[in-house]
Amino acid sequence: MIELLFLLLPIAAAYGWYMGRRSAKKDQDDISNKLSRDYVTGVNFLLSNQTDKAVDLFLDMLQKQEIENEIESHSQFEAELTLGNLFRSRGEVDRALRIHQALDLSPNYTFEQKLLAKQQLARDFMVVGFFDRAENLYILLVDEPEFAENALQQLLVIYQKTKEWKKAVNIAEKLAKIKPQENNIELAQCYCEYSQSLEPESAVEKRSVLQKALSVSPTCVRASLLLANLAMLDGQYQQAVKILENVLEQNPDYTGEILLPLKHCYEELNQLDNFELFLIRAGQIINNDEVELALAKLIEEKDGKSAAQAKLYQQLTKKPSTLIFHRFMQYQIDDAEDGRGKESLILLHKMVGERIKQTSPYRCTNCGYQIHKLLWNCPSCRQWESIKPVSNQEHN
């Protein structure tokens, strides 16, 4: 609604000029009062969240002013531009396109006004998915200082939607030069996407691109995971271990994502004891159920189920956890004798498991979107690097 209120500022200006002309030309207080009431009514509709009614009323006011041809040139441009925007806001993009195209082609307006028309015309094309036409307009606007940043942002949106990652990287680099703190995360993610779009045999270029991602965003866990994967494909397991273990310092929230590949590397190196040492160190730094479960599994493989069960029991007494309790119960079931007691354990284990399934393991920290797998771009709010594993506290 706030955006729509700003959108209506030109209407207010045109309306004020129009009312002044009407009052100066003739004594028509009844008409003036009618329009004044309409404007106030429209604002009230907005404030009461009746957006559709407000848009209808403001459209009617603008169209009446246009029909009577009593708006000065500058105000008429703003009014028509806004009229097109209002049509777009209510889904009538074809009418918005006609209005904005007419403004762009009209010989009656200045170069700066036509740039505004081009900007809104590009937005119309974006809404209907004509990305090639929007792209052409935004490329023109990039050369105009007042429009450049917005045009670059929209071009980046287009290239991300069309998955043209080399172009996306080029635009993201320009945005990062303008505002590094706001754009470096997105630039790093564009580097990651571009690296994944390259052919498998382009390993050298992939590494170079991923190193760029880490240079602009040192906490980019995705780049580290991709670099580790490249190292593993080349059989460079010690290098992969170094990269993966660094994630604990990079962003400990993602420690659970490295456990399987890290264990695989240590298995290939025949160094599972070092994997155990890493898990112990990680458990001292962060409270992460996956770390504790991985450690219990390792203890089971080395020393048997009883030792693993004792480890989980110790953990439960310190920090109760649904996930750890669920695994602990499985050990209890394995040891229990047949009978009602075991049946009760199986039922309880199943109920706890169903509760765990209902909890999404990942959540967007920006909009709250929940999902069952890790994505680097939120499908809901389109924010990069905002989806993270749900914490132990949220799980429990």
Curated annotation (Swiss-Prot):
SMART domains in UniProt: TPR (SM00028)
Membrane topology: Single-pass membrane protein
Residue spans, topological domain Cytoplasmic: 21-396
A GO term for molecular function: iron ion binding
Segments annotated as TPR repeats: 35-68, 77-109, 149-182, 221-254
Positions in coiled-coil regions: none
SUPFAM superfamilies, sorted: TPR-like
GO CC entries: cytoplasmic side of plasma membrane
InterPro entries: CellSynth/LPSAsmb/PSIAsmb, LapB, Rubredoxin_2, TPR-like_helical_dom_sf, TPR_rpt
Keyword Cytoplasm found: no
Positions bound to Fe cation: C364, C367, C378, C381
Protein's GO biological process: lipopolysaccharide metabolic process; regulation of lipid biosynthetic process
TM region positions: 1-20
Keywords (A to Z) from UniProt: Cell inner membrane, Cell membrane, Iron, Membrane, Metal-binding, Repeat, TPR repeat, Transmembrane, Transmembrane helix
Pfam families listed in its UniProt record: TPR_19 (PF14559), TPR_7 (PF13176), Zn_ribbon_LapB (PF18073)
Cross-referenced PROSITE patterns: TPR, TPR_REGION
Signal peptide: none
Its biological purpose: Modulates cellular lipopolysaccharide (LPS) levels by regulating LpxC, which is involved in lipid A biosynthesis. May act by modulating the proteolytic activity of FtsH towards LpxC. May also coordinate assembly of proteins involved in LPS synthesis at the plasma membrane.
Entry's family note: Belongs to the LapB family.
NCBIfam families: PRK11788.1-1, PRK11788.1-4, PRK11788.1-5
Official protein name in the record: Lipopolysaccharide assembly protein B
Biological source species: Haemophilus influenzae (strain ATCC 51907 / DSM 11121 / KW20 / Rd)
